[in-house]
Amino acid sequence: MEIGLREWLILIGIIVIAGILFDGWRRMRGGKGKLKFRLDRSYSNLPDEEGGSAEVLGPSRVLDTHKEPELDESDLPSLSASARDREREPKPVKASKRGKRASAAADVHQGDLNLSAEPREPDLFSDSDDDFAADNNRSSGAAPASNSVKELPPAEEVLVISVISRDEGGFKGPALLQNILESGLRFGEMDIFHRHESMAGHGEVLFSMANAVKPGVFDLDDIDHFSTRAVSFFLGLPGPRHPKQAFDVMVAAARKLAHELNGELKDDQRSVLTAQTIEHYRQRIVEFERRALTQKR
């Protein structure tokens, strides 16, 4: 059998390809040791002044930890001292408020609910709600309020809801305080409680709550031994920007107090507070807003 030119070319091509593959495989096997040797040699010849292998192996991390404490420890006492100073700032304010307690209590005493020690119900309230309006007028002309209490014009109308304790011992201080704090009232100006726009005690005052027993204030320093036969929620007009919404919040707070502490709701005429009375209060708010709008025109 004769082999032609085409068959010879195919055979030669196969031999050449096999030789190339064998040479490549031989170079790869022989080049592994050389490559590793060259790498090790290149690392060993790195200059020492640039850090050498220390930059690669990681001792620099130990050096970095020594560089971290760059804070001046002498500054720490000053920071803590300034923090303590900020915490102590409200204390003088509280002290000044106590200093005004005598004058504030005198004002509230003139406009309180004239609660007597006797359990007779007619003695729990004054003859009319004019005392609340007069009290609101005096409070607006008293010493400047804190930042959270905005000075308001004299009240033309005052909506009053009183809560009378059914228990002879009256409302106990700790339980009363817990209840009104849950309703968002905060202790403030005139040593009474105020409900602000924010539950945290910020924004304008929506309504207030006073002690119905003379002198009409609350003593937080002796709240554990405090008790009262009645408290009164009152909202003055003009007052909050949205009086109807503020009145609804006041009704909810009074109902919560009466429900949880066994109290009875009364209006400003010493009568039981009914749904009709609440609706009448709302109509008074609407009429007041209408008159105010007419006067502006």
Swiss-Prot record:
Residues 124-133 have a biased composition (Acidic residues). The chain crosses the membrane at residues 2-22. Residues 83-92 have a biased composition (Basic and acidic residues). SUPFAM superfamilies: Cell-division protein ZipA, C-terminal domain (SSF64383). Keywords: Cell cycle, Cell division, Cell inner membrane, Cell membrane, Membrane, Transmembrane, Transmembrane helix. Disulfide bonds: none annotated. This is Cell division protein ZipA.
